[in-house]
Amino acid sequence: MSDAEKTAHKEQVRETVRVGYAAIANGQSACCCGGSCNAHDPARLAQAIGYSAEDLAKLPEGANMGLSCGNPVAIAALREGQTVLDLGSGGGFDAFQAGERVKAGGRVIGVDMTPEMIAKARKNTDFYQQRTGLANVEFRLGEIEHLPVPDACVDVVLSNCVINLSPDKAQVWREVFRVLKPGGKVSVSDLALLKMLPDTVREMAAALVGCVAGAVLVSETRGMLEEAGFSSIELTPKPDYVRNMQNWNDPLYRQIAEALPKGEEMADYIVSLTVEARK
């Protein structure tokens, strides 16, 4: 594949994801990362992966769209006064929770490449500010491969089931390293592969938007982090997320399972992965 063809392919992937998530933001689709092709309550999924009912009750209506595969906010152990960057911030689900933890002296910046998601998050900001009295969360339109954030200005980078959607994950990690302050922390939940998926699954558009087809091997994630310059890398597989999707008979996961070799299941291939690292 030539350089021009590679560039065209990356743009095609971005556009597929952008269109899929615009439909989700507009309420025209529920098939997305986090397995919410299913009609299950997003709150049920969120609680299954570590969010408390109390935290969920504080969120603006529509901020939780069932797009998560872990709880990076809890893993990050945020402190008052920190500056936090949320990659692929969607409707503000993690950004608003982070905002309450860093308080008035802190700041949260959400970045998303989908205009419809940015509009939704900014609308939700009014509710957040009225409830908390805080004006410390903002949302910026941009691609996570080219973050609209200066060098060395962020204490913690969060992301929840988003980096796998990028057609250039190595560039994402380089950008994360660039914007972090020395000693800054990565706290990410994402989907990763235990072994390579069959081509029939990787070529499914629904599986791409659903965060499956774009996932890479756990070992590849470690390699990209190391190449970007990170240290203290900890990768923790959490299989319960995929098992929950299977048990809830999620339509996307059922469709993918039907394309797998006989006798194999989703949990043999896919896992929720917690990524922690330092600059």
Please place each PLM-identified region on the residue numbering:
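Conserved alpha-helix/loop element of class I SAM-dependent methyltransferases that forms part
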Residues: 37-83, 87, 94-101
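N-terminal auxiliary segments of SAM/dcSAM-dependent transferases
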Residues: 2-46
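C-terminal lobe and adjacent flexible extensions of AdoMet/dcAdoMet transferase-like proteins
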Residues: 4, 226-279
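Short alpha-helix
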Residues: 213-229
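Class I SAM-dependent methyltransferase SAM/SAH-binding core
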Residues: 71, 79-146
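Hydrophobic beta-strand segment of the Class I
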Residues: 84, 157-158
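Short, glycine-/aromatic-enriched active-site segment of Class I SAM-dependent methyltransferases
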Residues: 192-212
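A short glycine-rich, Lys/Arg-flanked "PGG" loop and its adjoining helix->strand segment in the class I
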Residues: 170-185
